[in-house]
A protein has these predicted regions:
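Conserved catalytic alpha/beta core of Sir2/sirtuin-type deacylases, generalized to analogous enzyme cores
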Residues: 1-160
Length: 160
């Protein structure tokens, strides 16, 4: 979609699928599995050594502490820099698209409550959807898988 629209992707996935698909403006709320951090500075990422990608107890980060994956584990806080960027992108959106999410994982589900009044909300999911509690935004549900649903939405948006 970036070839025709300004797009910011906010993802809870730790993989690099969006980048491999050509997306350039991706906010990884839960970190990136293909990067490392340290136990001392878990929000400062650096590239994994491609020749030695495994992490072992005793492997040291540049700051001397244990290496860890650059991901957010259950009950860990999201990096505030990434959360603020997500909130800002949401508040500036003309169109907000949710693809294949239960909308139950917080704090990401809170973003739906921050969508501007004039912003259109589209939800692409083959199943029935329920907005998070407290979110009363009207939405258009494209009951489809991600690829087909995004193609359908792209065609719709091009007509506007």
């Amino acid at each position: 979609m970036e070839d025709e629209f300004e797009v910011t992707i906010i993802t809870q996935n730790g993989d690099d699928f969006h980048e491999r698909a050509g997306s350039t403006n991706v906010i990884h709320l839960h970190g990136e599995a293909l990067k490392n951090a340290s136990t001392l500075h878990p929000y400062e990422s650096y590239e994994i050594d491609k020749n030695n990608p495994d992490i072992r107890i005793g492997d040291k980060a540049p700051d001397g502490s244990q290496i860890r994956p650059y991901v957010i584990y259950f009950n860990e806080d999201i990096e505030q820099r990434l959360w603020k960027a997500s909130v800002e992108a949401t508040k500036q959106a003309d169109v907000f698209i949710v693809v294949g999410s239960t909308m139950l994982v917080y704090p990401a589900a809170e973003l739906l409550k921050m969508i501007p009044p004039k912003c259109e909300l589209y939800i692409i999911d083959p199943s029935e959807v329920t907005l998070p509690e407290g979110c009363t935004k009207e939405y258009i549900h494209i009951q489809s898988g991600a690829s087909r649903g995004l193609e359908q939405l792209k065609a719709t948006l091009k007509l506007k």
